[in-house]
Amino acid sequence: MHKIMRLILVTTSTFCLAACSTVKHITVYQPIPANVIKTGTATAGAVSVDVTPPPGMPMGGYSIMANSGKGFRTRLKARVVYLNDGQGNSVALVQTDLTAGSLLVQHQVVAAVAEKTGLKASDIVITASHSHSAPVNHFENDFYNKHMSSGQGLEEQFLAFASQRIADGIMAAYENRRPAKVATGRKDIYGYNRNRSLDSYVLNDNVTDISLEDPEAKFKAINPAMYMIRIDVEDDKGRYKPLAAFSSFSIHATALSVPVEVYNSDLFAYAQKDLEWAIQRKYDTPWPVVHALTNGTQGDMAPALDDHGDNTFGHFEVNWKAAKKLGQGIGQEAIELFESLSSELTSDVEILTAARELNIRQNNTIGDIELCEDPAVGAPVAAGAYERRTPFLAAVPFLKGGNVFSRSWVFTEGCQGNKTHLGFKYLQPLFEPTDSFPNTVLFQLIKINDTLVMPLPFEVTTESGRRMAKRVSDEFATFGKNIKHTWVAGNANGYFGYTTTQEEYARQNYEGGHTLYGQYSTPYLAAQLGKLAKDMNTQEQVLELLPTWQYDIKVNQFYPDKIASTGKRTSLEQPAVFKAEAANEEDYIAFEWLDVGASEIQLHRPLVKVEALINGQWIEMHNAGEPINDDGYDLEVRLLDDEDLGMAEYQVRWYNPVAGGQYRFVIAQRGQQEELFSTSFVFAVDNAEATNKAISFVE
């Protein structure tokens, strides 16, 4: 018993911050938005901006198990879609490849763009694909700045970088708007997600057709809906061509497992870029196509990878091939949905938005529903979710969700129900003060024609999302308005962990344990959204914000120290081939070079590409429509080591190299460092010697 007690106390020690942490007071001034001029013509603009940070940021999602990013493979983006209905209403729909949105980022972005664009706080949503290989130390609360990654505290430089990049993206989309047409739609797709918490899902009162004995049940108990808002704009010759899609699919971006070492967009990268490249090629658009694919109700939706069972004492291997296959399947479904909407495009656009900002600890009742005033972490959070467990802790019954030891059997009548508090009920607040938890929700509704988007800062389970959507749709129906598509955008404008139904909560799986505000969270959120929907239909404008946007947050530094480089860029190791040795691995060609340090490398700018020698000329390479550069799928850039004179060693890996050509790596200019070229090389799969090493040529 004492050993178990010590283990639980050690577990709760992960909630501790060093006493010397610096607290920063941050104030964001609420702007006065400009008036949006009525032009009578719907307009739109869209842009993709890079938000890949320097090496060294802790990656979020896997908490203390996560690595710090050594570099990237598939860049992190913020995709912005600006839409104006011509009647004085506009929205900025922002999808990011981050683990979660941030209310602080949303506030800073609103403050940066409102006076120029007229966009109000209710008009801007910042969603996240929920990649578990992206930075997260940008929240307005200490709790998730401590516990969502392996680093503790707000990283001010990343906060400023992400906020500024998103604001710049909104401004660029706004300034490049063109006459627009819009279409909305839905397609149900199967075989891409599965329910990872089936034993909770079947407890829902309205679920009668799912059996735990059915091996296919986990593929049926899902949200299959892919939603999409397609936008075309007019080119210089008066022809309408595709510009963007803002879409949603419910799936955890955890196709890549815990040991991954570089920033990435997980399976979303493939689903996003496949559509962008395919549509741009087909329609020969004079602008880059933007596919802002975000997440929906992915709380209990795992990627439908091969099921290897649970992991108790270790992590599964990183499998990029499996992530790519699944992501490209989703991408093909998105392309088909996009194309099917061609005949639905209309220049008649109606935009309505509403927002109500609430401190839910201070405003924890609505009608007869009372939310917990004090949040609490359940014991199952320590052991993690199915397939992505915390090794060894998952072997402790009290910590592994879903079993009889992980939930309380006495004193279960309160708002936290049968949750067993991690570290015990009365000790947890000593390690984690309740004031450190997130408390402010921006309830928001965005209506574009017959589609209603409901952004929420929660990971919402499938059935929870259905109940919220029904509540909001019913409110609109009472006013004679038929909403065809109603969908939750999870992880948006902040992060609060999970929300399950009351029935699912009783099982106390990971999702229920991570429902901080208790068993009535979903009824409370549904009621608040329903009230907002009612007010949206009865009031001219609903925009209710807190009186001030002020935060006191513990800060830390993960960005590299700013050191001016004084050395000279040079090659270190010429291209060499590394063969895959396991089923989950890929062949790659590696090149190493000396370059400016981490503070100057600017990973958010293009850095590496592959060129092929064709008819005596070096041409930037493409393979089956995919550019072979660091904006594609197969180039990975990583920092190997710091060196003297402010310099650092880097490596680029070209995974899945194409046989039969003559190639070279090209490193883009940085500061005063000139463009750098590797020696040329070939790759041949039919020559044993050539597959063990690249053959270099001196030009």
Where are these regions (language model features)?
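Bacterial N-terminal signal peptides
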Residues: 8-16
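Non-catalytic substrate/cofactor recognition surfaces at enzyme active-site rims
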Residues: 21-699
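Bacterial N-terminal signal peptides that target proteins for export
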Residues: 1-9
